Amino acid sequence: MRRGAAAIGRRHAAAAKFALSWYHIIVIEKKLKTKKGEVILARDFTEEYIRCLGMGEGLGVFFHYRYQDAHKTRKILSSVSESGDTKLACVVSANCIVGYVLIVSPEADSRWSEINDALLGGFPALADPVLLELGSIEMSTPWRGLGLSRELLRFMFEDRIFEEKIVISRELSWTWDLRSTGLTPLAYRGKLLRLFESAGFRYCDTDDNEIGYAGENMLTARFGEKIPPEAVFLFHRLLSKREQRGWGWG
């Protein structure tokens, strides 16, 4: 029985390796050496590519890890990989996803969707959607501390499509892994800010209620090279619903 199971396991691994090698022709990949061995950064892949991969241990939902969460996440990544308005990049090791970053369109009827519409109304030459959101960036617990999140963000934004976009990231402290890192909320916030700044994001002031709920929460944004300065100015104005007044208006 053990020999049969081992043989099946070898055939499964060989099949996965063959499938991945076939999909290499349509996937943008970059090999990266780490202290734990070589990994592959991948993006612009199909749903079938995801199906050939397992989920790394310690990769769940936000800072929680349960098998069912990892399994659910794999299904989500598989489905969104086929969406034209969604961008996904992964860190792959030994045919398993050990990290990923997901960029999505703003939710319908949200404040960010309204800002997207306002930007398109003022600058109709911009492609819809012009505003995107970094929905999630996760790294498997054993693969943290290797600089992979920084490398993955840089790899994602090598895609020139983002030079025509504004990408926001809403950082909410209830999603942070404070327990395992031992960091205070403000220290974790600083760590995240440095991470996003390395990929071209900037800190932005906003009166958004969800972000303002906790002092350590923050909003950052990355402006593509092809976004007009006037559109950047309008974006910043739209981050506050308070009436804009000039000097001397009180």
Regions found by a protein language model. Name each.
Residues 136-138, 172-173:
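Short, histidine-centered active-site or binding-site loop motifs used for metal coordination
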